[in-house]
């Protein structure tokens, strides 16, 4: 990745976990932060428990107050009752941008049959793109190369409104 490609862009990484994850223990969130930084994207980090209202509140705060162009979530996209990240994301976006989530599912499916179980969504709130990544560090590492090449164009498009 050429770090000059994304200079000036800012992202938030939001980890969703059943227990408030300590930053040093958050492999998936830290992987996303590292990928962003390697790509020259300034990154802020936050975590929240797997409560739909808490996730929605964090997404709104990050999109509306932190001047981030992207929010990358990790966790809460599976099939358990507590996996509510997609619902919280749908609660706050203005419109869907399904290609990101679809590409993540396709890439995940190439590595494991379980890749079809992720329910992640993606969409736009204001001028911020929100993408749900799976909670597995391995799935994050496999999915990032599918998403990253599109970010410059996505940012430019969002900037135009």
Descriptions of predicted regions:
Residues 1-161:
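Non-catalytic beta/alpha edge segments that cap or flank active sites
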């Amino acid at each position: 990745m050429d770090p000059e490609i994304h200079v000036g862009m800012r992202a938030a990484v939001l980890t969703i976990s059943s227990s408030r994850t300590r930053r040093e223990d958050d492999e998936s969130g830290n992987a996303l932060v590292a990928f962003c930084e390697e790509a020259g994207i300034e990154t802020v980090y936050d975590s929240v428990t797997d409560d739909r209202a808490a996730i929605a509140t964090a997404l709104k705060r990050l999109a509306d107050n932190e001047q981030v162009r992207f929010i990358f979530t990790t966790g809460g996209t599976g099939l358990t009752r507590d996996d509510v990240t997609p619902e919280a994301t749908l609660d706050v976006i203005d419109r869907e941008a399904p290609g990101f989530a679809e590409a993540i599912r396709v890439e995940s499916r190439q590595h494991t049959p379980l890749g079809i179980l992720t329910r992640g969504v993606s969409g736009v709130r204001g001028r911020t793109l929100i993408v749900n990544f799976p909670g597995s560090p391995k799935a994050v590492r496999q999915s990032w190369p599918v998403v990253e090449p599109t970010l410059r164009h996505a940012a430019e498009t969002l900037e135009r409104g």
